[in-house]
From Swiss-Prot:
The gene is rnz. Disulfide bonds: none annotated. Belongs to the RNase Z family. Binds 2 Zn(2+) ions. InterPro entries: AtsA-like_MBL-fold, Metallo-B-lactamas, RibonucZ/Hydroxyglut_hydro, RNase_Z/BN. It comes from Mycobacterium avium (strain 104). This is Ribonuclease Z.
Length: 280
């Protein structure tokens, strides 16, 4: 069984009810944080997960709304890990990830220096193990395997999706993308597909061109559902709603997805959980 928790279902626009894009995946006793938008650690704390308990951080792409709390994750893990010789935090993302992590740590160098000067048991900066990938296997530990494939969020490039497999259960996390062959291949036969969705029918009516531009490189509800149908997944989990999902409108979103996908559709607020089982 794999458990998926939508930690943050919001967008770049601050929302009092939704944290920034982030998803927690638990499998085989391991805890994977996929993206780290604003407020991610508060949401993780609500389900009993702290930064020190993360097995790895997986980044789909380097847009600010998906990495906005990277510094908080790095520093909080560092100061809340009390074992000697802590294991470096594995961080897996597309090319550019190493530069982002290094720049983030550099920006926090004063804070890091203050803490090292103050605490005798903090004698080195936060330890990280950054690996950049665009395709293929990236993780294989205690029965949990993860592989990535390229997605299409151009002009943001490269971008990747993740597939987590454990004891016959499988979950794919698409990140931000339009329909593409890489995601179709990655999601083929998966138990669940976690996919960003936008309501293009609503966004297209906004007068500001900058906001209309987001239609160019995100999937609509119908497009995400069509991807799920092509791939033959069991469940479509919608997240990163643009505009924000309003209470009472859930059935509108479900109806749009149902035009293309006959399977189970999950959507909801932050902390919504979905259990993905192996086929019986």
């Amino acid at each position: 069984m794999i458990e998926v928790t939508l930690l943050g279902t919001g967008s770049p626009i601050p929302d009092p009810n939704r944290a920034g894009p982030s998803t927690l995946v638990r499998a085989g006793g391991q805890v994977f944080l996929v993206d780290c938008g604003r407020g991610v650690l508060q949401r993780a704390a609500a389900v009993g997960v702290g930064a020190a308990g993360l097995s790895t951080l997986l980044l789909t792409h380097l847009h600010s709304d998906h990495v906005g709390d990277l510094g908080d994750v790095l520093i909080t893990r560092w100061v809340s890990t009390f074992t000697p010789d802590p294991v470096p935090l594995p961080i897996i993302g597309p090319p550019g990830t190493a530069e982002l992590v290094a720049a983030t740590l550099n920006a926090l160098r004063h804070d890091i220096g203050y803490r090292i000067a103050h605490h005798a048991d903090l004698n080195a900066p936060p330890a990280v193990d950054v690996r950049e990938h665009t395709d293929g296997p990236v993780w294989d530990r205690d029965g949990v395997s993860i592989r990535v494939a390229p997605t299409d969020h151009r002009p943001v490039a490269p971008t990747i999706g993740f597939r987590v497999d454990y004891q016959g259960a499988s979950v794919v996390l698409a990140g931000d993308t339009v329909p593409c062959a890489g995601l179709d291949e990655l999601a083929a036969g998966a138990g669940a597909l976690v996919h960003t969705v936008i309501r293009k029918d609503i966004v297209a009516t906004i007068p500001q061109q900058r906001l209309q531009d987001i239609c160019d490189y995100h999937s609509s509800v119908e497009q995400a559902a069509a991807t799920a149908a092509r791939a033959g997944v069991g469940t479509l989990v919608m997240t990163h709603y643009v505009p924000a999902l309003v209470a009472g409108q859930e059935e509108q979103w479900r109806a749009l997805a149902a035009r293309e996908f006959a399977g189970r559709v999950e959507l909801g607020d932050d902390l919504h959980r979905v259990q993905v089982d192996a086929p019986s």
